[in-house]
Regions:
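Class I S-adenosyl-L-methionine
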Residues: 1-182
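C-terminal target-recognition/interaction regions appended to catalytic cores
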Residues: 122-280
Length: 280
């Protein structure tokens, strides 16, 4: 049995020479697996429909050896399993950004980061928690004052002031600010999106500068990104926080590790369904 995941763009035909007849890589993979003796079913799935607080559409392919069975019912079984699975965890199918990270505000207080010299990490908030936050926290806060990898980036005064203006006056949330608007608002980077707390997050990427926190003038922490990806707080993330230049080819920093991952909350549901398919 095979479970294969990739970005939605994997299903598009890209041809550097712009010739007719370009074939999506997804088709090549499917054809190759069939030649190897697999029954194959592919689909594009939005993980936000499965309790993950993030709009993340991914190409999912399931392959089962022909002598064992067919993966045809994978998506149907996934949907049938979803509601009872989420109910058991106290969750609904659509979790908003606010419901996922409202307890990780910088205003809760901060202490020196234990794994990042010269930086500060945020303390846990003690406000009423959502069911999603309770699930992600587990018992971790009983033995830890701060969440793992919840270290705040250092930002210039100019950038902080720019972020404050955006939070106060920019009319749209959840839409990327680039082009003329970027220059008009004094944004130095290539673009940024102000997150909307009342809906699911856009797709988490490996770039920390893509998103502005919904109510604080700062970018997201690794832990906040991990929460949105449904990694529980006990899951420790290692290595550097960021990297750059030529080292991008050699290192996989924390933001990238999280941005490239399959959300565990979806992976668990997929695993349950795959197990049922093998046993049937």
């Amino acid at each position: 049995m095979i479970l294969f995941e990739n970005v939605k763009g994997f299903t598009y035909a890209f041809d550097k020479n712009k010739k007719d007849g370009a074939e999506p890589y997804s088709h090549k993979v499917i054809r190759g697996l069939k030649k190897l003796g697999y029954n194959v079913k592919d689909q594009v799935i939005d993980f936000s429909q499965f309790g993950v607080p993030q709009r993340r559409k991914r190409f999912i392919l399931v392959g089962i050896r022909k002598e064992i069975g067919s993966p045809e019912n994978f998506e149907k079984l996934l949907m049938e399993n979803r509601d009872p699975f989420l109910a058991q965890k106290g969750l609904k199918s659509n979790v908003t950004l606010l419901e996922a990270i409202s307890d990780l505000l910088r205003s809760n207080g901060e202490i020196p980061s234990p794994d990042r010299k010269g930086f500060y990490s945020g303390k846990y908030g003690h406000t009423k928690l959502t069911n999603y936050e309770k699930l992600m926290r587990g018992d971790y806060p009983k033995t830890h004052t701060i969440a793992d990898s919840h270290s705040f980036a250092k930002q210039s005064t100019d950038k902080i002031e720019c972020y404050k203006r955006l939070l106060a006056d920019y009319p749209q949330r959840g839409k990327r600010i680039d082009g003329d608007a970027r220059e008009q608002w004094g944004i130095k980077q290539r673009g940024i999106t102000i997150l909307d707390p009342d809906t699911v997050s856009p797709t988490i990427t490996g770039s920390p500068d893509d998103y502005l926190h919904y109510c604080e003038p700062r970018i997201m922490t690794v832990r906040e990104c991990a929460r949105i990806q449904s990694f529980p707080d006990w899951y420790e993330i290692k290595k550097k926080y960021t990297t750059g230049g030529k080292m991008r080819k050699l290192e996989v920093p924390r933001y990238t590790q999280i941005g490239n991952a399959i959300p565990p909350l979806f992976a668990e549901q997929a695993g349950i369904v795959l197990k049922k398919m093998l046993q049937s």
